[in-house]
Amino acid sequence: MTRRIKTGIPGMDDILHGGIPERNVVLLSGGPGTGKTIFSQQFLWNGLQMGEPGIYVALEEHPVQVRQNMAQFGWDVRKYEEEGMFAMVDAFTAGIGKSKEYEKYIVHDLTDIREFIEVLRQAIRDINAKRVVVDSVTTLYINKPALARSIILQLKRVLAGTGCTSIFVSQISVGERGFGGPGVEHGVDGIIRLDLDEIDGELKRSLIVWKMRGTSHSMRRHPFEITDKGIVVYPDRVLKRGKILEL
């Protein structure tokens, strides 16, 4: 029986029938404003509360900004960094400016996937990480989409090999039907897609689990909200043809 890794996000583990199977790599796909980053950070924070060390790979935002944004939800990771439970991999600044003074793990050349993997592997080793978030994986192949699946598989090999359960944040444009990059959906164990739809003149958030290797899961689209404590998913409600229905 595969061990389950609880997301700790209210309602989400019900939809996943117990959590994400250990070592799975999950693509968290969605357009702008859908809540991808918050979901992934909440997954890491909840892991820390369960005693599971975690790593956040920052590709889209300055690491300082990431820490500030997390703290707004009450997720202050600095204490865990000092205790060797949490690590930030800076793949945003390339070590320019003051980052090299503050950040321990820096990727200097994003076009060199081997350097990226080596820095990530070192961070995993140092803190014995159990959870990893890459935000966003799309940045790694935005200029070379043909390599998307290859890059995903290289990362998956390293992460699953070290026993980590991982979330790859994947960006898609508004209205796009795919998951962000050609063939990426075939290189991961799970896909959770977040959406933002207009219903009766109001934007509503929802998510659906497209696939999750190693477990059954809800096949319905469930609404969720972003609160001041993070994401809350409603497993007893379904978004259907522009309406939210109670189950």
UniProtKB/Swiss-Prot annotation:
Homology family: Belongs to the UPF0273 family.
Q: Which key words tag this protein in UniProt?
A: ATP-binding, Nucleotide-binding
Which residue range or ranges hold the KaiC domain?
3-247
Q: Which GO-annotated molecular functions does the record name?
A: ATP binding; ATP hydrolysis activity
Q: Where does ATP bind?
A: G30, G31, P32, G33, T34, G35, K36, T37
Q: Entry's InterPro entries?
A: AAA+_ATPase, KaiC-like_dom, KaiC_dom, P-loop_NTPase, UPF0273_KaiC-like
Q: List the protein's name.
A: UPF0273 protein PYRAB02580
